[in-house]
Design a protein with these regions (language model features):
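Hydrophobic alpha-helical transmembrane segments of multi-pass inner-membrane transport and secretion
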Residues: 15-42, 252-287, 310-319, 362
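Hydrophobic alpha-helical transmembrane segments
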Residues: 4, 18-22, 322-323, 346-354
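Short beta-strand boundary microenvironments
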Residues: 114-157
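Short cytosolic juxtamembrane segments of multi-pass membrane proteins
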Residues: 370-383
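Mechanotransmission and gating elements of multispan inner-membrane complexes involved in transport
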Residues: 83-86, 106-112, 138, 150-152, ...
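Transmembrane alpha-helical interface segments in multi-pass membrane proteins
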Residues: 278, 286-332, 351, 355, ...
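Hydrophobic, regular-secondary-structure patches
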Residues: 26, 30-114, 135-137, 200, ...
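A short amphipathic helical element positioned immediately N-terminal to and/or at the very start
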Residues: 3-12
Length: 383
């Protein structure tokens, strides 16, 4: 077997080509890991948002989008008095009548951006139990409460969404009264407004939905039966987890686009690496002949060349790991209903290492085999 140190020396003898191959491997591994992290983060964020005990009551025909839903006022009281399996807190049912509205928010300096605005009452904190008020308090009339990551979704500076700052919505100036989080969900990129205020600002008479927290998941059947029995109310009950699972399915093509872009760019980098390896190995044909002449067969030389190219792939992976840990880890990526945070898990890092290794093997095999095909006399006579 050819010594491992021989492979290292060959890489050091051609630092320019080695750096080129390592950089190409780094780019490919980085693209693959970023695509994997985006897929995982978006899917996990949408999955975390749904509570298995929560049910969303929407208008019939609006199961795909709460924003398009219309639910009559008073439905929450009717449900609270008709269903026995609703969780009670302080002898009151956990029912949150809400309006979900996509609208433009502006800062005082005129910068505008579209936000997901949720009109709620205090009881929303009972229903959405992941929500925690970090600073300030729940909004009173003329005030709003913003999510911890709302500035990422809106593209504003963090300082513009601090307590006491003013945002403009539909010509009304609203004072930020609090900041909340809901770790790992899309909620923490939202803006919450008192329900009655939002109905006034948007001139709406109906709700978007009613979110109900049940004592246990099996109580959903009673709630579902109620909506089917009361045809006059035109309601549909959908479990919150199912709603966000459908949203995740809706965004699946976007997640696939990330993979497709990473794949196409990786193919380009792979061909560039193949070209560099062909040039590198072709200039060493005489060296391969000399190694065969002293007793090493072609298979051992082939293995040595694959090890050599695999080393560049693994070094590229290590560089990609460094970029991921120092720069990309924790970056927030906005999308239409919120933001997700890139998280490079151990599985994703293992995928990156495997990609670098496979890239080295696949990239090194064709040029190595092409250079080892000539007979020993032809190899020794090669210029």
């Amino acid at each position: 077997m050819i010594p491992f140190s021989h492979c290292i020396r060959n890489l050091l003898r051609r630092p320019g080509q080695s750096c080129q191959l390592i950089a190409g491997s780094c780019v490919v591994v980085l693209l693959v890991m970023t695509a994997a992290s985006m897929n995982h983060a978006m899917k996990q964020t949408l999955g975390n948002t749904g509570d298995p005990l929560n049910t969303i009551i929407v208008g019939a025909g609006s199961e795909e989008s709460v924003e398009r839903s219309e639910v009559k006022q008073g439905v929450a009281e009717i449900i609270g008095s008709s269903i026995s399996g609703i969780r009670q807190i302080m002898d009151k049912p956990s029912l949150s009548p809400e309006i979900h509205f996509n609208g433009m928010l502006s800062t005082q300096d005129g910068k505008s951006s579209q936000a997901l605005i949720r009109g709620v009452q205090h009881v929303a904190l009972w229903v959405h139990q992941r929500v925690r008020i970090l600073e300030g308090r729940f909004p009173n009339p003329g005030e709003i409460m913003v999510g911890r990551l709302a500035h990422k979704k809106l593209g504003f500076n963090r300082s513009q969404l601090q307590i006491g700052q003013i945002l403009v919505f539909n010509g009304e100036e609203l004072i930020i009264s609090g900041i909340f989080d809901a770790i790992g969900t899309v909620l923490e990129a939202e803006v919450w407004v008192p329900l009655q205020d939002l109905m006034t600002y948007t001139q709406r008479e109906n709700l978007s939905c009613v979110v109900v927290t049940l004592d246990e998941a099996r109580s959903f059947g009673d709630l579902d039966a109620f909506t089917k029995r009361r045809l006059d109310l035109e309601l549909v009950a959908i479990q919150e987890t199912e709603y966000y699972t459908k949203l995740s399915t809706f965004y699946k093509p976007i997640r696939w686009m990330a993979w497709i872009c990473a794949f196409l760019l990786s193919i380009g980098a792979l061909f560039g690496g193949l070209n560099a390896l062909y040039a590198s190995f072709s200039s060493r044909i005489q060296e391969f002949g000399a190694i065969q002449a002293i007793g090493f067969n072609r298979w051992k030389i082939l293995f040595s060349l694959i090890v050599e190219s695999s080393i560049t792939g693994l070094i590229g992976s290590l560089l990609a790991f460094g970029i991921v840990v120092l720069i990309l880890q924790g970056i927030t990526v906005p999308f239409s209903i919120g933001v997700f945070v890139l998280n490079f898990t151990q599985i994703i890092l293992a995928l990156g290492a495997g990609t670098g290794l496979v890239l080295g093997v696949i990239g090194g095999l064709p040029p190595a085999w092409n250079c080892l095909r000539p007979s020993l006399p032809e190899t020794l006579r090669a210029a």
